[in-house]
Amino acid sequence: MRKHLGGCWLAIVCILLFSQLCSVKARGIKHRIKWNRKVLPSTSQVTEARTAEIRPGAFIKQGRKLDIDFGVEGNRYYEANYWQFPDGIHYNGCSKANVTKEKFITSCINATQAANQEELSREKQDNKLYQRVLWQLIRELCSTKHCDFWLERGAGLRVTLDQPMMLCLLVFIWFIVK
């Protein structure tokens, strides 16, 4: 019985150490040498145009096709024209500590609507279908965003973030068993 408990403790310690080592990124000598690297712009060099590009609610268009169900007709239209649609939204509304998921999604949609008025009101031949697919895409993109503090409300320990607490818990249990 004593050897079995020792093996369990050894397995737990190995798992904790392995999870710690997996989160550490290895960096070799190549990363220390800064050959041909561009100098990052200072805050004084950031122009209004660059700031306008990353305003809250701005679309991110990289030409990726997303896996979202728009209905039969909408899916066909999206398959043919996915490159015209955004595949992300610049939005970080997590500054308020008490924001709920519903409020976050609503404010994300409102910010996106305000930031992209010309594209949302653009006249196209297939305007109704384009608008329907675009609005469903915006709702879906806003609903997939999340705030880190929502995770903290859940129960349980996260091994990667609570490792000191796990170590203290292991030491405490070890003293109780001993």
From Swiss-Prot:
Bilayer topology: Lipid-anchor; GPI-anchor
Lipid modification (GPI-anchor amidated glycine), residues: G154
Annotated SUPFAM superfamilies: Prion-like
Domain of life: Eukaryota
Residues with attached carbohydrate: N98, N110
GO terms for cellular component: external side of plasma membrane
UniProt GO BP: acrosome reaction; intracellular copper ion homeostasis; protein homooligomerization
Signal sequence, renumbered to the chain: 1-25
InterPro entries reported in the protein's UniProt record: Doppel, Prion/Doppel_b-ribbon_dom_sf, Prion/Doppel_prot_b-ribbon_dom
Keyword annotations from UniProtKB, A to Z: Amyloid, Cell membrane, Copper, Disulfide bond, Fertilization, Glycoprotein, GPI-anchor, Lipoprotein, Membrane, Metal-binding, Prion, Signal
Stretches for region Flexible tail: 27-50
S-S bridge residues: C94-C147, C108-C142
Tissues expressing the protein: Strongly expressed in testis. Detected at low levels in ovary, spleen, kidney and mammary gland.
Post-translational note: N-glycosylated. O-glycosylated.
Subcellular location: Cell membrane
Propeptide: 155-178
Region annotation (Cu(2+) binding) ranges: 124-141
TM helices/strands, residue ranges: none
A GO molecular-function annotation: copper ion binding
Region (Globular): 51-154
Recorded family membership: Belongs to the prion family.
Function, in words: Required for normal acrosome reaction and for normal male fertility. Can bind Cu(2+).
Written domain comment of the UniProt record: A short helical region is required and sufficient for Cu(2+) binding.
Protein name in UniProt: Prion-like protein doppel
Protein's gene: PRND
